[in-house]
Regions:
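Ribonuclease/tRNase effector modules and their secretory precursors
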Residues: 1-106
């Protein structure tokens, strides 16, 4: 999946002190979150449990250096607003690698 197909009119990212500081607790930089959205393979899942006020999604992907992250985000005014980001846990890495393999074999 490509972000350009998922969000063809993407206008960038929306950062503020709140989402920056939350990610730093997990030692994840803003630029790492952004890289995840532009590297393939990319696995995006809806997050209905946390989508009360707005639709949230979780993206599983990797940075340019290969760090595997889960980034929870929402879309606001054609911008990606990152809610949280952290390293994938072991089972999430297994899920991501399996889903990524399926994408490649399509």
């Amino acid at each position: 999946m490509r972000m350009t197909t998922e969000y063809p009119e993407l206008a960038g990212f929306d950062w503020d002190d709140g989402n920056r500081s939350k990610n730093l607790k997990h030692v994840v930089q803003n630029w790492e979150c952004e890289q995840v959205f532009f590297n393939e393979p990319l696995v995006i899942l809806d997050d209905p449990r946390h989508s009360v006020a707005e639709d949230r999604r979780a993206v599983f992907g990797h940075t340019d250096s290969g760090r595997k992250l889960v980034v929870v985000y929402t879309m606001r005014n054609r911008r990606i607003r990152v809610i949280s980001a952290r390293d994938m846990k072991r089972k999430e890495r297994q899920f991501y690698e399996s889903a990524a393999k399926d994408q490649i074999n399509i």
